[in-house]
Structure formats: C-alpha cells, structure tokens
Amino acid sequence: MRRPSLHWLARIKHLPLSDGDWSYSRPHREDDPAQGWKLHLSATILSAADVFARAEPVLRENDALFKAPCRLELLKSLNSGLADFSQIGKFLTIYPRSTEEALRLARELHRATRGLSGPRIPFDARYREKSLVYYRYGAFRRSVEGTPGFIRAPGGRRYRDKRAPGRAVPRWLEDPFRKSRVKSSKRPGLLLRDLLAFKAKAQRGKGGVYEAVDLSVLPVRRVIIKEGRRHGETNWDGRDGYALVRHEAQVLRKLRAAGLPVPEIFREFAQNRNRYLVLERISGRPLLPAKRTQPSRISWRLAERILEQLEPMLSRMHAAGWVWRDCKPSHIFLQGGTLRLIDFEGACPIDQTRLPPWGSPDYIPPSSRRKFSRRAGTFEDDYALGVIAFQFGAGKFPPAAAHRRAALYRRTGCPEVLREKIDRLLNSKISRRRVK
C-alpha cells in the first residue's frame, strides 16, 4: 500500500507558528489585510507531499502568509467533508496581500502543481480547468486569529463570510480571475436528459446520494443515484469516490447473481469526471436510522429474529466469495417483512488482504481498526453481526471485556444458546466460508 514521503511533514513542523492543527508560514502582520482574495490548493493524502514540495518555494519566495495541516489525518478528515462540507480539499490556504499578488500567486501555483491530483473544493471558484488552485473572496482574520467571519463592502456594510454556492465572488466585486475561470454549463438537478435529482440524501467528499426521478421509463420511477467523485476521499490504497462506485457496481452484480437481496442496477455512467449508479430505490425502513446509535425497542427475541434472517444472507455472501465489511443496522432495510441490504463500496473478496479498514468504528473488530491491511476471512462481518444482535438485545454496544458482557447477559436474561452464538461472532478470527 502506497504511503507518502514524510519529508514534507518535517518541513511543515519547522514553520514558525502552530496551533496544534495548522502550521503557519509567518506571524500575521499589521499590514496584512483583513479580507481579500483567498487562495486554496487542493490535495489528497497521497498527493499532499508533492503539492507542498512544489508550492512551498513559490510561497516562500513571495513571503506569502499561508497555513498547512500539521498531520495528514487532518487533511483526510477535511477531505471527508463530514465535519464541514465546504472544507473539502483545502490543503494549503494562502492569504495574498493584494489582488495583484493573488493573481500572480494563482498563476505561479497553477504552473507549479500542474498534473497533480486533488478533490474539487466546494463553493470556491476554480482557477482553470483541472487546476488545483481555487479562490474566493473572504475574511482572512477568521482563519488566522479565529475572529468572526465578516467582509465589508466598499460602502462599509458588513456581510457574513458564507461558504455557499455562488458566493465565491461577492456581487459587489468584479472577478479579477474571470479570464481564466472555469465556466460551468451544468443545469442544477439534471444529470442526464432523463434523470432528475430532486433531493440529496447524503453529501460528503467521496460523493453524494440522491433521490431522483427516472424519466426514461413509463410510468416514471423514483430511483437512487449514487455519485463517486474523482479524487474524492482518496484512501491510502489510492481508491477515490469514482473507483468506489465503479467497484460497488461490480459487487452488486455479483451478489444479485448469487441471490442476495441487494438493489438492482438500472444504469451506470460517467459525467463531468464523476461516476454514477442509478439504483433501485429500496422502500421500507432501516433497522436503525443513521443518526441513531441504539434501537428504542429491544429484546433478545428480537435479536434472535434478526440473526435468523441476517446470518443466512451473510453465509450466502461469503459462500459467493465476498465479505461486506460495512454490515450495520442503517444498511439493513426491513421491506415487507424481509431484509434488504445496501451499500457495498467497501466489500472485497474474502481472501483480499491489501486493504485499509472500512466501515463504522463501532462495527469494526477492535484489532483491525488501526491497521493498514486486513487478514483473509469473514471476521469483519461476523463481528458486526454479533454487535447488531447485542444491540437489539441489550440496547448498547457490547463491552470488549468478556466478564462485562457476561454481567449484561445475566442482568437482561439472555438465553445461553444465543449468548454463546453472539460471543462466537464477536470473537471470530477465521473465515467461515465453506470449502467445496
């Protein structure tokens, strides 16, 4: 698995100022403006070392004020968009002292970083097609000093410095980058002529999930569109949102062929350098909504019924040679008394080992959470299945210590046979795939 050079981290740590998360090239000076044309350089966790190595000489030569993350883990978190969607891709932030300096730095940084990869930065304007340089007019001191984010118009009126669509250039300013700026011809909501997205169900760095209407059939049907963005949340193994959606399409086709209740694929296509899956919309409800951690209704009988339905499905999946690696209640839908399974971006062949961990931390075996590879087997699914059963029986996640689980089993009256099955799943270390 590819890891970037740590040389750039050493150079960042030698920058004169740090707040623990960000390192700064120099202190803020009195003659530095409070607002202006802010530049951002985008990077993935794999391209960050090269982006920094090429950009730093340009910035140092111009004595530019800039900040960079102290750790790659911070960039990885920013690129996920989970905490703040507007921060995706913002590896280097530069605070030019004038419009002229902003134009010069944008031009030089674009040339210096040409050919490197980085995710598209939401709400910023892109300097040129395929450029890593983005810009927006905004407050500087909020980022440097933590003061409130407001900008002033020429007449003195204050406006909140919002990061939102169409807000990169305030309406009272001319865009000095307009000759090089990328023009968007995309019509909102329309992916293809016969697909109309009307609601974003989820939005993060690697892509979005949308409810849409498919106009290509009569009667028209509601569908789910899954988007994979190029360079979105690029992982240590080099896979980005685009690659994950393409991979999920392959997995879904194989699992449907094996008789698993996964969504049907209606269409797959690429547009604007992103990849899209048009999927069957699963009606019904998830076992547990994504924003809830524990079920409101619990009983060991309910846990047993879930196991009775879900365990044979996972056994069939494993017999087909696949491990899900993202088994959790929000990915399991109850539809007309039967279970339907969704979200297979992280699925892999049982014997594949060169992959980083995948899934929600509470459903990943503790021994696998900080590793950069996996051992062969179905242990991720086994552990997750044990966690789900425990949740619906006890109303909480299973304690790691066996004696604490035993106390909960006794206090809540868990049948011994079910208790043994759950503990066996939680302690699974080998593949349960049957050899034919």
Language model feature labels by segment:
Residues 318-334:
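Catalytic-loop of the protein kinase fold
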Residues 306-307:
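Activation segment signature within eukaryotic-like protein kinase domains
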Residues 343-348:
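Activation of the activation-loop gatekeeper triad in protein kinase-fold domains
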Residues 264-275:
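Short beta-strand micro-motifs within the conserved protein kinase catalytic domain, predominantly
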Residues 1-213:
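Phosphate/pyrophosphate-binding loops and the adjoining catalytic core of nucleotide-dependent enzymes
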Residues 354-368:
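Conserved activation segment of eukaryotic-like protein kinases, specifically the C-terminal portion
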Residues 37-40, 199, 206-246:
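ATP-binding glycine-rich loop module of kinase domains
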